Amino acid sequence: MYKIGFIGLGNMGAPLCERLLLKNKVNIFDINKSNLNKMENLGGIVKYELKDICENDFIFLCLPTSEIVEKITIGDNGLINGLKKNVFVIDMTTGEPEVTRKISNILAKKNVNFVDAPVSGGPKGAKEGIIAIMAGCQEIIFQKVKPLLNMISTNVFHAGPTGSGHSLKAGNNLSLIHI
C-alpha cells in the first residue's frame, strides 16, 4: 500500500482524491473544512497541519494556481522544510511551466521528485476515471508514479521532461478557446 497525501480538495481535487481512496488510505489537507469533511466521510485521513502531509511517499497537489503551489512547496512554511528524500510531489494544478521548472529544480536539490501532471476532462471525467493526465518528468520518475496515476485514470501519458505536462495543458486550453 502506498503512503499518499493529497492537498487541495476543491472541484477537481476532490474527485481525483476519491479515485485514490478507492484503493488506498489517503492523508488529506485543505484550508476549507467542508472539503475536508466530505473526503473524511469517504475514508480520507484528515491532517490539520501542512507539515503532517510530509510523512507520505507520494504527495498530490490540486490547487488554484502555480503561485499557491510554489508557496506550499518551497515557501517559508512550505513542504520543503519537512519532506523526506526520494518523495514524489505530483502537481495536478493547471500550472505555469516556468514556475513548475523552478519548483522542480529547488526540490531536486533536496532529492525530492516533482511531477507536473495536469488534467483535462473536468470533474465528471475525474470521477469516472477517464480524465486525461499529462505527466511532465523524467521517464524513470514517470514509471514510478504511473501506477498511482492509473488509479485515477485510464488515460495517462508521459508528456516529456518537467514542465511538459503544464505546457501541453496550456496548449490544450488555448486550442479549446478557438473551438
Can you annotate each of these PLM segments?
Residues 1-61, 93, 123:
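NAD(P)+-binding Rossmann beta1-loop-alpha1 motif at the extreme N-terminus of oxidoreductases
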Residues 4, 9, 94-174:
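Rossmann-fold dinucleotide-binding core
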Residues 17-19, 40, 71-74, 101-105, ...:
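Short amphipathic alpha-helical segments
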Residues 23, 42, 55-56, 86, ...:
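Structured helix-beta-strand junction loops
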Residues 50-61, 66-112:
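Rossmann-fold NAD(P) dinucleotide-binding segment
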Residues 177-179:
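Conserved small/polar residues in nucleotide/adenosyl-binding loops
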